[in-house]
Amino acid sequence: MHCPFCGANDTKVIDSRLVADGHQVRRRRQCLACNERYTTFETAELVMPRVIKTDGNRDSFNEDKLRGGIQRALEKRPVSADDIERAINTIKSRLRATGEREVPSDMIGNLVMEALKELDKVAYIRFASVYRSFEDIREFGEEIAKLEK
């Protein structure tokens, strides 16, 4: 790493500590040329896979779209904001864990349905009705029957 004071690239790490609940490393460094000390922070850059839409187009992963869909399904339901954030983070982690550079949009939809099934059954049915394009009341009944098993 280049020294911010003199630009030399000979530096050494004096101290390292985990901060931000272990999601960041704070390093104390010293330049070997000018002996100045400074602090750096390191975080992992977590890249989300691209999304392959049903029409074949490719799009960047949009966390706001994911959050909006989940919040719409959970509207006026007794689920905490923390539980929603946990579900979103779990979905993102599972997508990254695939190791793929691109994932189909239906995979994301299925992960959302799994998360909603755990959080709130009514929200699950709401989301499923739109996601699976239910045509009539019979399809609602079939999905509810699956939940009751």
UniProtKB/Swiss-Prot annotation:
User: Signal peptide: which range, if any?
Assistant: none
The reply on keyword Transcription is yes
Q: How is the cofactor bound?
A: Binds 1 zinc ion.
The record's disulfide annotation reads none
Gene Ontology molecular function terms on file:
ATP binding; DNA binding; zinc ion binding
Named cofactor requirement(s): Zn(2+)
Q: Where are the zinc fingers (unnamed)?
A: 3-34
Q: Which GO terms describe its biological process?
A: negative regulation of DNA-templated transcription
Q: Does the keyword DNA-binding apply?
A: yes
Q: Which UniProt keywords apply?
A: ATP-binding, DNA-binding, Metal-binding, Nucleotide-binding, Repressor, Transcription, Transcription regulation, Zinc, Zinc-finger
Identify the InterPro entries for this entry. Answer: ATP-cone_dom (IPR005144), NrdR-like_N (IPR055173), RNR_NrdR-like (IPR003796)
ATP-cone domain location: 49-139
Family stated for the protein in its record? Belongs to the NrdR family.
Q: What does this protein do?
A: Negatively regulates transcription of bacterial ribonucleotide reductase nrd genes and operons by binding to NrdR-boxes.
Name this polypeptide is given: Transcriptional repressor NrdR
Q: Which organism was this protein described from?
A: Photobacterium profundum (strain SS9)
Q: Which gene encodes it?
A: nrdR
